[in-house]
From Swiss-Prot:
Keywords: Cell membrane, Membrane, Synapse. The gene is dlgap1. Coiled coil: none annotated. This is Disks large-associated protein 1. Its main location: membrane. It comes from Danio rerio.
Length: 999
């Protein structure tokens, strides 16, 4: 690849060398470039521009290196190209005739020999530079002449003498012959070089003639790479490193030199060519660059057309076809590859190289076949089809709005792209800017950006192991691209092979990126998504998740499955999770999701749980505030974490069915290591805050994995994936089981989740639950609690919610057992408190009777109804139970118990009031007070006493009714909260899955 780009950069090299920099300023050089750029026809090419008069004004506009580069590129390419634009026998004089006298002189010196399809613009420039450097024209002319002869020989070996039209027979002949039509045709062909991509040339460039002639490549490259030569070299100045390297390798372009260059030592030297003195003749540099270009390009086409995975085999075949030329080419290729490998110091460099090669291939490949990397219309692209290929479409989608026709992406798109690139791979962005910023046209920049972005995304979203270049090339989608594209990609893959592993993965990524079967996946996300990615990137960085997560099962997120964590980053939107109830489409999913989330969370907790999650968990009760505030935070963070790592955990849970009773704890183990690292800190902090914030109420629940909603949401996030599994049945039992098996880790997770999840899912349930549970647990039996039975009900409900959440918000036996246990403890506390008060205080018999009645009722309820309900719950948990009650049965029985519990709570409420009144009956005072007024009216007194009694009775009844109403209201509120919490949990879980799916 670098060889190709290097050929372009060779002129660059020449110009870059201090000795050659002046060349760029020469009118000769500039005119060459100008004519190339300005003239659409071959005459316009630097090759033809040489023939055309070079005007100083042209030179001025193209005095930049790229222009010189263009001219040198064109010349190199033309020279390299077998295409006989100037005609094998067409002397440079033709072009010179059009040129000014000074230019003609330079040409005479530089182009004493007919171009024979070889353009010597570089040589001319080099010669000019050399002349300026006081190099003798004779020496330059001699060098140029010898180089041209050598090229002629090598090209004749190629069979590309395009001018001769015998190229078809040669490896590059298919194209060479078209290009290599008689010199007279040369101009026509030259002009056709552009049209070639459009129509005739595509045939030549078809896979049969898949070898792009160096001439074609050069011409196209020139056309397409006016200023990009530097880009092709990835910001590296190929002029020095490459040119020097080539100079050393090609000082003498002969078999011996080639052999030397082939040797590893020479290759190393080539890579270190930068040390080569600049004193080397520009012509030598030119020879090196042009010769390497011709050999490299044509030969590369040969070798890579072979489509042989083994470059050596391809090279051997090439040698069999043409021993001498193949040998030279191999040597050149090896040097180029060595150079490339040396240059590929980092992935960025590799990517840049890949991009450069891809762009080069795009321009070199028959552009009619090429659908990708279309250049801006402002740039004359021989092949307009490039703008309408499937690849272009893919790239356009990848650009997310960057239409091929648009010279630049919209500012919004640019901003999004920049943010995305920054979030994903700032280095790539930098490289892209480096590479594309100055030398490419805006459209080229867009393409390059899109390409880099695609590549980076591919690297991000696809595991390297999945990017087998061979598989990619063999894939129908890849083939669906164009043959030419395949050739380009095959070339890339071959180069990759030459570059060894350094280039392998990157190239495969490049191939995949170019192929981009899922362009939509790479569309730029919103800034919020990018921010979420930024937050999750560090976590996603935990590649262990990929291995840790089992094979993506049927997770809704295809991208995640394909790319797991990295993909997750891209696919998962961290921001959405905070918006819990997106759509509660599948309660089952939510349940399952919870399990999966649970597994993911468990994994987190297992790793982080050891951090002290268990302690915090037990201590952690989601206070209303903590739940609310943490709700968004936890939901977002856990959602992001679960999603980031969730994919792994999800996948793990999916494959392992984390929901499974036993598996959940194991799953956490696999996932936890990777997951905990990223999530733990935030979650730990949050959990710590929540725990510190208070609420033992959830303490019990946390023990139970706290509010089911909490757990649910936590699990909901990861569960999202598991939701896909839809294993609600497993989830309820499993999650509880998981809690117990992984009690420490899971409990921590759940507590954390409860705090986190409950916030978003249980929301209201947790709010009152936190307070209520805390109150009751703290109070035990505080008479004050009795007056507001709502709290205990709420807390109970919340507990149940916790249990439910823990069991994916599913009301299973475990969940109800937790509720029952909490209720039993509460009632026992009341009974103990009343008994203690009875012993400590002297009370009227009436009060004692009430106390005993309330305590007896509570004990009876606990001994009978509660025991019966406990048995039902156990049966529900027992899969072997034949008449196994379902969750609905348990819920119905629990509702019945609520009535009895309310009655008992009313009794204790009354006792609480009596206690507040120092155990004195409440009615007598009222009666007395009311009796006093009646005596005032003498007549009404008779009726008044009954009235007073009625009033006292009414007041008592009112109080009872009010208490009952409060209890009923509390019950209804608790039921509503419980239901809403469950629903919200389900919806949230579903939402999370959807978010993941929407990824």
């Amino acid at each position: 690849m670098k060889g190709l780009s290097g050929s372009r950069s060779h002129h660059h090299v020449v110009t870059c060398d201090p000795s050659f920099e002046s060349m760029g300023h020469h009118l000769d050089h500039k005119p060459y470039l100008i004519s190339q750029i300005d003239n659409p026809h071959p005459v316009d090419h630097s090759y033809y521009s040489q023939r055309s008069p070079y005007q100083p004004d042209c030179v001025v506009p193209y005095g930049t290196f790229p222009r010189r580069h263009y001219s040198s590129q064109h010349e190199l390419k033309d020279e390299m190209a077998v295409v006989p634009y100037s005609g094998g026998g067409v002397p440079a004089s033709k072009g010179q005739q059009r040129l000014p006298v000074a230019l003609l002189d330079q040409f005479d010196r530089q182009l004493p020999v007919p171009r024979d399809g070889y353009h010597t613009l570089q040589y001319k420039r080099a010669a000019a530079a050399l002349e300026q450097r006081s190099d003798s024209p004779g020496r330059i002319r001699h060098l140029v002449h010898s180089v041209q002869k050598l090229f002629t020989k090598s090209h004749s070996l190629e069979g590309p003498h395009h001018g001769h039209g015998h190229g078809k027979g040669s490896i590059n002949g298919g194209k060479a012959s078209p290009d290599g039509e008689p010199p007279a045709i040369r101009h026509r062909k030259r002009s056709k070089s552009r049209e070639r991509c459009k129509s005739a040339e595509p045939k030549n460039r078809t896979p049969p003639s898949g070898y792009w002639s160096s001439d074609e490549l050069e011409r196209e490259a020139c056309l397409f790479h006016h200023g990009p030569p530097g880009v092709m070299t990835m910001g590296r100045h190929p002029d020095k490193s490459q040119s020097q390297y080539f100079l050393e390798a090609y000082n003498t372009i002969n078999d011996q030199a080639l052999k030397n260059s082939r040797s590893n030592n020479d290759l190393g030297k080539c890579s270190t060519c930068t040390s080569i003195p600049l004193s080397v003749d520009a012509s030598q540099l030119v020879k090196k660059s042009s010769w390497s270009s011709s050999l490299t390009v044509s030969r590369a086409r040969q070798v890579y057309q072979k489509a042989s995975v083994n470059v050596d085999k391809a090279l051997v075949k090439a040698e069999a076809c043409q021993q001498e030329r193949s040998c030279q080419f191999l040597q050149l290729w090896k040097c180029v590859f060595v150079e490339l490998s040396v240059c590929l110091d980092a992935d960025m460099h590799v990517w840049a190289k890949v991009c450069d090669v891809a762009s080069l291939l795009n321009r070199q490949v028959p552009q009619d076949e090429w659908g990708g990397f279309p250049l801006g219309k402002d740039e004359d692209i021989p092949c307009r089809r490039m703008r309408s290929g499937s690849y272009v479409k893919a790239m356009a989608e990848d650009d997310s709005g960057d239409s091929d026709g648009s010279p630049k992406p919209s500012p919004k798109m640019q901003a999004r792209r920049a943010s995305y690139l920054k979030a994903t791979q700032p280095s790539l962005t930098e490289m892209t800017t480096l590479k594309i910023s100055q030398e490419h046209s805006p459209k080229l920049q867009i393409r390059s950006h899109s390409y880099l972005r695609a590549v980076s995304e591919v690297s991000i979203n696809r595991s390297l192991d999945t990017l087998d270049p061979k598989a990619l090339l063999a894939s129908p989608q890849y083939r669906s691209r164009n043959e030419s594209y395949m050739r380009a990609m095959s070339t890339i893959s071959q180069i990759e092979a030459m570059c060894e592993s350094v280039f392998n993965e990157m190239e495969s990524h490049a191939v995949d990126a170019l192929d981009l079967p899922m362009p939509g996946c790479f569309r730029m996300r919103s800034h919020s998504y990018v921010r979420a990615i930024d937050q999750g990137c560090s976590q996603d960085d935990d590649s262990p998740l990929l291995p840790a997560s089992p094979p993506r099962t049927t997770t809704t997120v295809r991208t995640i499955q394909s790319s797991t964590v990295s993909s997750c980053i891209t696919t998962y939107k961290k921001t959405p999770p905070p918006v819990p109830p997106r759509t509660s489409t599948k309660p089952f999913i939510s349940i399952t999701a919870q399990s999966s989330t649970e597994s993911a969370q468990d994994a987190y907790m297992d790793g982080p749980g050891t951090r002290g999650e268990p302690v915090l968990h037990s201590g952690l009760s989601n206070s209303t505030e903590s739940i609310d505030s943490m709700k968004a935070l936890t939901a977002a963070i856990e959602a992001a974490n679960a999603q980031i790592h969730g994919p792994a955990s999800q996948h793990v849970s999916n494959s392992t069915m984390t929901i499974s009773t036993a598996p959940p704890s194991p799953l956490p183990l696999p996932v936890p290591v990777p997951v905990p690292i990223p999530i733990p800190a935030l979650e730990d902090v949050r959990r710590d805050v929540l725990r510190k914030s208070r609420c033992l109420s959830i303490g019990i629940q946390s023990k139970f994995q706290s509010v089911g909603v909490q757990v649910e949401e936590e699990h909901g996030v990861t569960t999202a994936v598991q939701a896909d599994l839809d294993t609600p049945d497993y989830t309820p039992a499993d999650s509880p089981v998981t809690d117990f098996p992984a009690a420490g880790c899971l409990s921590r997770q759940y507590s954390r989740d409860a705090a986190t999840s409950t916030v978003s899912i249980q929301g209201s349930g947790n709010h009152y639950h936190a307070c209520t549970s805390d109150d009751y647990e703290d109070v035990g039996f505080d008479p004050s609690i009795l007056p507001p039975p709502d709290p205990w009900i709420d807390s109970v409900i919340e507990d149940s919610l916790e249990v439910v959440g823990r069991s994916v918000c599913q009301r299973d036996g475990r969940w109800f057992l937790k509720l029952l246990q909490a209720e039993t403890e509460r009632m026992e506390g009341w009974c103990r408190q009343m008994e203690h008060d009875e012993k400590e205080n002297k009370m009227p018999d009436e009060v004692l009777g009430k106390i005993r009645g309330a305590v007896g009722s509570a004990q009876l309820l606990m001994s009978q109804k509660f025991q019966q309900f406990r048995e039902l719950c156990e049966e529900n948990l027992n899969p072997n139970a034949h008449p196994r009650p379902v969750a609905q049965d348990l819920a119905g029985f629990w509702d019945m118990l609520q009535l009895s519990i309310e009655n008992i709570s009313l009794k204790f409420d009354e006792l609480h009031q009596l206690k507040a009144n120092n155990w004195r009956p409440l009615d007598p005072p009222e009666r007395k007070e009311r009796r006093l007024p009646p005596p005032v009216p003498k007549k009404p007194p008779k009726a008044h006493p009954p009235l007073a009694r009625d009033r006292s009775l009414e007041s008592t009844e009112k109080q009872r009714q009010e208490a009952r109403k409060r209890l009923m209201a509390a019950k209804r509120a608790a039921s509503v909260r419980q239901n809403s919490a469950t629903e919200s949990a389900d919806s949230i879980e579903i939402y999370i899955p959807e978010a993941q799916t929407r990824l």
